[in-house]
């Protein structure tokens, strides 16, 4: 990773949302480095119009403005591979923010090369995980990349000082109309929307119900359950209720339906990679449905030991993504194993959505390992000889019997 020399910085590619922080960063970079700023705005399904960012950038004299629809690439190449692993961090978090950063880092590096830029920049703070994710992703793809992280350099340490800077530099903040200003720091993409700050900084304070943007409260959800049939090919959803859909379309549809039924709300305290604990609230309707359904189809099609091995490796895989190592040898190795395991994960899962809960109520597959003739409680016509269990138990209990015969008390 190259060291920063301000005198050599002439062009900077900025990950730009058009919001307060990155608008101020754009101006700050222009003034501090006397450099040309090139903006990159990614549409990864945040649910807002990204085009207004163009007008905002133009108003600051920015000539090269990149606005790209990356929803399909994000869903297909990042979210879906992660869900083949059933990845969750610390038992609950579906990695919605973590998985979005590698793609943005990748495009930052690529655009920097296109423009022969000297540096890239982002709006992540010096306290969070995103700075790590952006910069590890960038250096993995371009070892000589120079990254400018203004939050680690400037003296604008509060929202008030940011607002003052914006006023002094004639930076218009609210380009989205008259929407009510949220007291929370929010980040959204196809997989989730996150909320931090405000009253959430007190881990005992319950989030206000009007905070949630994507879902109704389970209490207000419909009184009638909704059923969905999700069709899988090699571990990925390819159709919903018989309608073939692209990965990003799958997520849009499941977010809409799941949100209507109060699916996917989460309130957690997590351990950040940088060392502190952080309280966050998340809405992940599609991801919650996808995780439940994927485990449902795997239960039918995966060999027992393969399934158990996946479960053992999953926490390491999830931590790898959470900590920013998507572009790493270990993630690629784990992904190869995971993808191999999905070869026969084909079929249909039927799920029931009702007042915040997702239940698998049916599953079928031409690649099913479930053998009704063997598993039945009725007459199996000799398919399974129950006498075989006697020897199985005797051999598996042999070591325990030897322990007991030596007078060792295994009850304590």
Swiss-Prot record:
PROSITE patterns: ARGININOSUCCIN_SYN_1, ARGININOSUCCIN_SYN_2. L-citrulline binds at residues 93, 98, 129, 133, 185, 194, 270, 282. It is an enzyme of class 6 (ligase). Pfam families: Arginosuc_syn_C (PF20979), Arginosuc_synth (PF00764). It is found in: Cytoplasm. NCBIfam families: argG, PRK00509.1. This is Argininosuccinate synthase. It comes from Psychrobacter cryohalolentis (strain ATCC BAA-1226 / DSM 17306 / VKM B-2378 / K5). The gene is argG.
């Amino acid at each position: 990773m190259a060291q920063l020399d301000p005198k050599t910085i002439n062009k900077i590619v900025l990950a730009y949302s058009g919001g307060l922080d990155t608008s101020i960063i754009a101006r700050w970079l222009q003034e501090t480095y006397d450099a040309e700023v090139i903006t990159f705005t990614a549409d990864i399904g945040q649910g807002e119009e990204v085009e207004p960012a163009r007008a905002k950038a133009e108003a600051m004299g920015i000539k090269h403005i990149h606005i790209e629809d990356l929803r399909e690439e994000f869903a297909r190449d990042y979210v879906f591979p992660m869900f083949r692993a059933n990845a969750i961090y610390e038992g609950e978090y579906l990695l919605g923010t973590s998985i979005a950063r590698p793609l943005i880092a990748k495009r930052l590096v690529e655009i920097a090369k296109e423009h022969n830029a000297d540096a890239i920049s982002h709006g992540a703070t010096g306290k969070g995980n995103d700075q790590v994710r952006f910069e590890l992703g960038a250096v993995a793809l371009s070892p000589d990349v120079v990254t400018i992280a203004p939050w680690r350099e400037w003296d604008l340490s509060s929202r008030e000082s940011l607002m003052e800077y914006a006023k002094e530099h004639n930076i218009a903040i609210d380009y989205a109309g008259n929407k009510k200003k949220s007291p929370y720091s929010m980040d959204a993409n196809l997989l989730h929307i996150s909320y931090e700050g405000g009253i959430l900084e007190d881990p005992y304070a319950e989030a206000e119900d009007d905070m949630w943007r994507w879902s109704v409260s389970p209490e207000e959800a419909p009184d009638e359950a909704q059923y969905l049939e999700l069709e899988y090919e090699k571990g990925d959803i390819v159709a919903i209720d018989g309608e073939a859909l692209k990965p990003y379309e799958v997520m849009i549809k499941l977010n809409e339906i799941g949100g209507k039924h109060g699916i996917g709300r989460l309130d957690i305290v997590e351990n950040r990679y940088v060392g502190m604990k952080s309280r966050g609230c998340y809405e992940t309707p599609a991801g919650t449905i996808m995780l439940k359904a994927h485990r449902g189809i795997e239960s039918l099609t995966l060999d027992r030991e393969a399934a158990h091995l996946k479960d053992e490796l999953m926490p390491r895989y999830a931590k790898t993504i959470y900590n920013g190592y998507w572009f790493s040898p270990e993630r690629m190795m784990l992904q190869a194993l995971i993808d191999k395991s999905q070869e026969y994960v084909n079929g249909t899962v039927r799920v029931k959505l009702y007042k915040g809960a997702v239940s698998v109520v049916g599953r079928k597959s031409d690649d099913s390992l479930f053998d009704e003739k063997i598993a039945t409680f009725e007459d199996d016509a000799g398919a399974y000889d129950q006498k075989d269990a006697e020897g199985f138990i005797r051999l598996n209990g042999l070591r325990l019997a030897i322990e007991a015969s030596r007078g060792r008390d295994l009850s304590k």
